[in-house]
Swiss-Prot record:
It catalyses: [glutamine synthetase]-O(4)-(5'-adenylyl)-L-tyrosine + phosphate = [glutamine synthetase]-L-tyrosine + ADP; [glutamine synthetase]-L-tyrosine + ATP = [glutamine synthetase]-O(4)-(5'-adenylyl)-L-tyrosine + diphosphate. The gene is glnE. One of its GO terms (biological process) is regulation of glutamine family amino acid metabolic process. Residues 1-475 are annotated as: Adenylyl removase. It holds the Pfam family GlnE. It is an enzyme of class 2 (transferase). Keywords: ATP-binding, Magnesium, Multifunctional enzyme, Nucleotide-binding, Nucleotidyltransferase, Transferase. Its EC number is 2.7.7.89, 2.7.7.42. The lineage of its organism: Bacteria, Pseudomonadati, Pseudomonadota, Gammaproteobacteria, Pasteurellales. It comes from Pasteurella multocida (strain Pm70). This is Bifunctional glutamine synthetase adenylyltransferase/adenylyl-removing enzyme.
Length: 986
């Protein structure tokens, strides 16, 4: 319907005449005369009154019911500055109140009078859209707190004053929820409140004490009546208490402790959304209980971790609202309809709930204050922010004009011509704040109802575009197969139907029994576990996606129990189920990794926090550069309390597990060759060793101080890595072969601690502490198994030796096998000068003259001893590590070459890893380049196979038919070295 603006003015003039006819006669004549003469937009006092009367029946009725207010307006029309300092103006009125009947009257008349002023300012565009809803909120807060304080004094006189254990008087705290909490109250809105008090106890000062709970419940009931009860003067605010814990079935007022327990254990999604805007009304910053209550509620709303339930819960709420809109026929509802106010609120709440725990700028209730913060974080574009802001203000302007007409809570567009005309006039031109909080006038091409609808629909379309992009459309209908799996979880299909599904997935019939048994066990487990509604919804969403992917995989018999075990472990940790629902690529990634690695499946099941690592495929396939492990680890530990040893120890384990997953994923998916895998695993271990030593040093020095002979900043301590750590060849399950050395000073004592001990005892305590940190079995598992048997004198030797004692032992007492071990050693931790000293000792020992025949005899004897001890009896299989032609033979060959040729060429002692040992041997013409290349290739191939067997959780054993060529070549080289002593040239 269209109508010209001249017709609108005529209609409103006629309406004004009808409404003014009820005014006292002395006002009627002057207004009628003004209507007859003033044809332009009203500018005079009477003209403004006439216009405001025409725009709002409520304004006219308030003038009629309160003649003294009409007289005030006649003398001077309301201004925006008259709509302030509500508490200061209400307090003297309440001071004169003697009973509850008078209280009801004063509150209602004050509320209507002040609302009428705001209606006037809104109609005449004397304040911005924000000015109006902020003042509406301030008015409500002042009235609520004024009523509470008056009733509190009466209640204390009657029932005594509630106090805590220290005898301090307690007050009733009121949480304003929804738009009241966000200073965004509608013109005619319900107010959502929650009542709480600091602690239990009893009242004092009355003839008969009652407990605090009863006192505050009665006070709350009286306050609700004072606000909500309808009298001849109307009501103050429709009061809704259903947002309190347990809703209508819960206590009207709860203590802080009871409220905290509820939100920790039973708080639901919609309560988190509601609590975003929760604000303590009348809060006094000097009141310690105010801060306590705020701190109590914040963790419930703003989680420290990213909560992926938010998106799905918002979708569910959206669909629920859409069903309500359809059911109630609310097609033209500017709040609940598509692109309406609620969708803008949802958009902002999504980011508050997902990011608010980490971004404090998002932890505020006012939507228009949060919106630019979201844009500043680049979560939405500047254009999207502006679209949402403009739409919100237009919709809120429309909503408040609608509600001010009859003081009715409505968001439904009017069907009658009169109210449509009012909206047209009110939305053509109005003021609002810009992004710099400065007043701006906005003008829309609105001249009739049709053009109003066009503008409205454009705003709604802008909102819906952002909303759909963020929240996402409703998921597509499940396929028939997915529906069947969904029904299986709900116990709605029989075993025969499961068999039919397996046939459709091309599963071998011989596997049916095993698969169905595992599925039934899983379903029975789900049935008896208390996973809650949210968890059950997430499970029914993830399983129909998970199971078809498992059965599409060739390794489904191995994969099914691994994946079911992971799901079983996260059944009661709904956030992780929802992570897999919201991130299908993460689920697919997990399936692929678990298919190829039992180790990963077990780790993820034991530590579900690792699922977070699957979210970023890019990061997953790109482990940090070698030199970044140390900085990444330190950055990771910064979020922990440095003095909390237990927390730091767990943090080290969690970092290792997460990083190990990234390395394994890159390995499985082909992003890392075997040599790089070992490099990454080794540098990861080194970074952890550095932090462990620092942590142990901190603990030991706190108690004993530091050795007096050390210069400032020195530790005088070396960690030597042997074996695979020393050779930069760590595998996924490798332990750490370590030797600890220290800078000696026989007479030195520690100083600066609680107790002084000898320096050698200090380093022994340090070594023990390091081993303890590595080996202690926490919930997060063991950090690394540590093997100290390669220290001087082995298990009978000191746990930590001085550098000088180590040198003497290696030069004069070490066995040949210990010198072999020294080949694969290198300094991992310690001051540069000490590492240089160790390198010199190592080079001196390895290049010392030795009898070649004795060396050959010792090496062969040690290898024979290992064969006998680690013999693999199964002739049908090959142990890659210990059998002839395997890894151990290659390692012995490398060690022998160094010990045999370093006396003539000390440069051959430079490297500790087998690959570079072979390379330097070829460069020095000890072996040919061809043999070097073949040895390296054999070694890499064998290690690669071991890596992948480790990932599968299997032993390093393969069928006898594998690696026959490699084994034959290695045995040939062994034979030439130790039985013919040739020049090893081809």
């Amino acid at each position: 319907m269209s109508f010209p603006l001249a017709h609108v003015d005529a209609t409103l003039n006629q309406l004004a005449k009808q409404l003014i006819a009820h005014f006292p006669e002395q006002y009627q004549d002057q207004i009628f005369q003004h209507i007859a003469t003033d044809k332009e937009k009203p500018t005079s006092n009477i003209g403004q009154l006439r216009y405001a009367i025409a725009m709002s029946d409520f304004f006219a009725e308030t003038l009629q019911k309160q003649p003294h207010f009409l007289h005030q307006c006649w003398q001077q029309c309301p201004r925006l500055q008259d709509c302030e300092q509500y508490a200061e103006r209400l307090t003297p009125l309440l001071a004169q109140v003697e009973n509850e009947e008078q209280l009801y009257k004063v509150l209602r008349q004050f509320r209507h009078r002040e609302m009428a002023k705001l209606s006037f300012c809104q109609s005449l565009n004397l304040g911005s859209v924000e000015d109006i809803f902020i003042r509406l909120s301030q008015l409500a807060e002042s009235v609520i707190i004024g009523a509470r304080d008056w009733l509190y004094q009466r209640a204390c006189a009657e029932m005594g004053t509630p106090v805590d254990e220290q005898g301090t008087p307690l007050q009733l705290y009121i949480l304003g929820m929804g738009k009241l909490g966000g200073f965004e109250l509608n013109f005619s809105s319900d107010i959502d409140l929650i009542f709480t008090y600091a602690s239990n106890g009893e009242t004092v000062g009355a003839r008969r004490s009652i407990d605090n709970a009863k006192f505050f419940t009665r006070l709350g009931q009286r306050l609700i009546n004072a606000l909500d009860q309808y009298t001849c003067d109307g009501f103050v605010y429709r009061t809704d208490m259903r947002l309190r814990p347990f809703g209508e079935n819960g206590a009207l007022a709860l203590s802080f402790a009871a409220m905290e327990l509820y939100y920790q254990e039973q708080g639901r999604d919609w309560e988190r959304y509601a609590m975003i805007k929760g604000r303590i009304l009348g809060a006094n910053a000097q009141d310690p209980h105010v801060n306590t209550l705020q701190q109590l509620l914040r963790p419930f709303v703003y989680r420290r971790y990213i909560d992926f339930s938010v998106l799905q819960a918002l979708r569910d709420m959206k669909h629920k609202i859409e069903r309500e809109v359809r059911r109630r026929g609310l097609v033209d509802n500017i709040k609940l309809g598509a692109g309406g106010i609620r969708e803008i609120e949802f958009i902002v709440q999504v980011f508050q709930l997902i990011r608010g725990g980490r971004e404090s700028a998002l932890q505020q209730p006012a939507l228009l204050k949060v919106l630019p913060e979201i844009s500043a974080l680049e979560l939405i574009s500047a254009q999207q922010q502006e679209d949402l802001r403009q739409a919100y203000l237009f919709l809120r302007r429309t909503e408040n004009i609608l509600q001010a007409i009859h003081d009715q809570q409505t968001q439904q567009l009017p069907e009658n011509t009169l109210d449509q005309q009012r909206l047209v006039l009110a939305t053509q031109r109005f003021t609002q704040w810009d992004t710099q909080n400065k007043l701006e006038t906005v003008t829309y091409p609105i001249h009739d109802w049709a053009s109003f609808c066009e503008v409205l629909q454009q705003h709604q379309q802008n909102v819906r575009t952002v909303f759909d992009h963020l929240i996402g459309e409703e998921k597509e209908e499940l396929s028939e197969t997915e529906t069947l799996w969904h029904d299986f979880l709900e116990n709605e299909i029989e075993e025969s139907e499961i068999e039919q599904m397996l046939i459709e997935h091309h599963i071998e019939e011989r596997d049916f029994h095993e698969i169905i048994e595992k599925l039934m066990q899983f379903r029975n487990e789900v049935t008896r576990r208390p996973i809650g509604t949210r968890g059950r919804i997430a499970l029914t969403q993830v399983m129909p996606t998970l199971l078809p992917q498992i059965f599409a995989h060739t390794a489904y018999l191995h994969l099914l129990p691994r994946m079911l075990n992971i799901v079983d472990k996260i059944l009661t940790r709904t956030t992780y189920l929802e992570l897999l629902v919201e991130n299908p690529q993460a689920l697919t990634q997990l399936i692929e990794l678990c298919a190829q690695s039992r180790m990963i499946a077990e780790q993820v099941a034991r530590h579900p926090i690792l699922l977070d690592e699957l979210l970023d495929r890019n990061a997953l396939l790109n482990p940090p550069p070698y030199d970044h492990y140390a900085s990444e680890l330190r950055q990771y530990l910064l979020r922990l309390t440095p003095d909390d040893e237990e927390q730091m120890i767990d943090g080290l384990r969690q970092f290792k597990q997460a990083t190990l997953l990234r390395i394994a994923a890159a390995d499985i998916l082909g992003a890392l060759p075997v040599m790089k895998v070992s490099d990454h695993l080794t540098f990861l271990a080194e970074a952890i060793i550095h932090v462990v030593v620092e942590l142990a040093w901190q603990q030991v020095t706190t108690r004993f101080g530091t050795p007096a002979h050390l210069a400032e900043g020195e530790k005088g301590f070396l960690v030597i890595g042997y074996g695979k750590l020393g050779g930069i060849e760590l595998g996924y399950k490798s332990d750490l072969d370590l030797v600890f050395l220290y800078q000696s000073d026989e007479q030195s004592q520690t100083c600066g601690g609680k107790r002084s001990i000898e320096s050698n005892q200090f380093y022994l305590r340090l070594a023990q502490k390091i081993i303890s940190i590595f080996s202690i079995n926490t919930f997060a598992g063991v950090l690394y198994e540590v093997d100290m048997r390669l220290r001087p004198s082995g298990e009978s030797g000191l746990l930590c030796s001085s550098i000088s004692a180590f040198k003497a032992y290696q030069l004069h007492d070490a066995w040949t096998w210990e010198k072999q071990a020294l080949v694969r050693s290198r300094a991992i931790y310690g001051e540069a000068r000490l590492q240089t000293e160790f390198n010199a000792i190592r080079a001196e020992v390895l290049s010392a003259p030795r009898d070649l025949a004795t060396l050959q005899q010792d090496v062969v004897a040690m290898r024979q001893k290992m064969y006998a001890h680690l013999a693999h009896p199964d002739s049908d299989t090959f142990n890659i590590k210990t059998d002839r032609g395997g890894i151990t033979d290659i390692e012995f060959i490398a060690q022998y070459l160094v010990l045999a040729h370093a006396p003539q060429n000390p440069a051959l002692t430079r490297w500790s890893d087998n690959v570079r040992i072979f390379e330097i041997m070829a460069e020095s013409a000890v072996i040919s380049q061809e043999i070097c290349d073949q040895l390296k290739q054999c070694y890499v191939d064998l290690r690669n196979r071991i890596h992948h067997l480790n990932l599968l959780g299997e032993l390093s054993i393969v069928p006898q038919t594998e690696f026959q060529t490699e084994r034959q070549f290695i045995q040939t080289i062994w034979h030439r070295l130790f039985e013919h002593n040739d020049k090893y040239e081809e």
